[in-house]
């Protein structure tokens, strides 16, 4: 029942375990660092300046930590929004090509244009069924067949024929190819592992400096709550950096399937 409830929100058990692990690691790092920090700092209990100095350093480190996370979250969200805009533009170009191929099939060279129209439908279906899931993998990649379909559509066109539609469709194919490469770039724009090591180090240092006072149960609960909040921000960054996978992934079907093309794709 729990797994079914997760699926309702587009959340798999694997994603739940990974995201939960991020939060648990953040809490564990903070609590352990606080206990260790107390063991170290109590040796200087006779120096009254230590707690004041520690409080000042904590404020600075927490401020730096929040600044880095806020900056990264903003960049990740902007990348996510650009991925949506790119997919929307690609879907628009696919719809225009589909419509233009339909008109060209009635005007001249009907067999080739009709073939190109069916290739456009096959390309959209391939993007939804194969390329989108591949972009959501740990190592994002484009689907080879989708590239072949675009090449076949080019071969079916005659851009020197003099018609406005054939020229526009040829240009549209170039735009689709460019946007398709952009999708791969959006999928690969992720924070390096070194960044997360720095974040974990700053979190541990902040919590260790909070150890100037004995770690009572209530203090540990408060520190764990703070670390949990940091962990939630980290997993939100992680989700935004995966625009084609995860529980906030862009829905390819809703973007790429307008009514006139959805009718051409047989339901599975």
Predicted regions and their residues:
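Hydrophobic alpha-helical segments
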Residues: 1-12
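Alpha-helical transmembrane anchor segments
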Residues: 10-44, 53, 184-268
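Alpha-helical transmembrane segments of integral membrane proteins
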Residues: 21, 58-65, 225
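Residues within alpha-helical transmembrane segments of multi-pass membrane proteins, especially transporters
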Residues: 32, 61, 65-68, 72, ...
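Loop-to-helix transition at the N-terminal end of transmembrane alpha-helices
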Residues: 47-61
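Transmembrane signal-anchor/signal-peptide helices with a preference for the extracytoplasmic
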Residues: 67-88, 241-244
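Residue-level detector of alpha-helix boundaries and kinks
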Residues: 78-79, 161, 225
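Structured inter-helical modules in multipass membrane proteins
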Residues: 82-84, 89, 95-186
């Amino acid at each position: 029942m729990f797994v079914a409830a997760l699926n309702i929100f587009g959340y798999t058990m694997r994603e739940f375990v990974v995201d939960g692990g991020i939060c648990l690691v953040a809490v564990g790092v903070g609590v352990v660092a606080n206990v260790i920090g107390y063991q170290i700092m109590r040796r200087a209990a006779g120096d009254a300046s230590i707690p004041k100095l520690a409080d000042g350093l904590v404020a600075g480190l927490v401020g730096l930590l929040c600044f880095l996370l806020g900056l990264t979250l903003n960049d990740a969200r902007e990348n996510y929004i650009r991925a949506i805009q790119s997919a929307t533009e690609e879907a628009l170009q696919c719809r225009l090509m589909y419509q233009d191929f339909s008109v060209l099939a009635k005007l001249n060279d009907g067999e080739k244009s009709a073939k190109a129209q069916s290739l456009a439908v096959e390309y959209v279906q391939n993007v939804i069924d194969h390329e989108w899931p591949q972009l959501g993998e740990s190592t994002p990649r484009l689907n080879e067949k989708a590239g072949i379909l675009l090449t076949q559509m080019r071969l079916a066109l005659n851009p020197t024929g003099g018609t406005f539609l054939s020229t526009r469709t040829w240009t549209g194919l170039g735009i689709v190819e460019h946007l398709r490469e952009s999708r791969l770039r959006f999928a690969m724009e992720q924070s390096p592992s070194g960044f997360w090591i720095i974040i974990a180090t700053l979190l541990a240092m902040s919590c260790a400096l909070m150890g100037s006072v004995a770690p009572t149960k209530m203090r540990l609960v408060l520190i764990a709550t703070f670390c949990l909040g940091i962990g939630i921000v980290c997993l939100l960054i992680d989700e935004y950096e995966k625009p084609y996978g995860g529980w906030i992934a862009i829905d390819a079907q809703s973007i790429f399937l307008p009514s006139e093309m959805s009718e051409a794709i047989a339901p599975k």
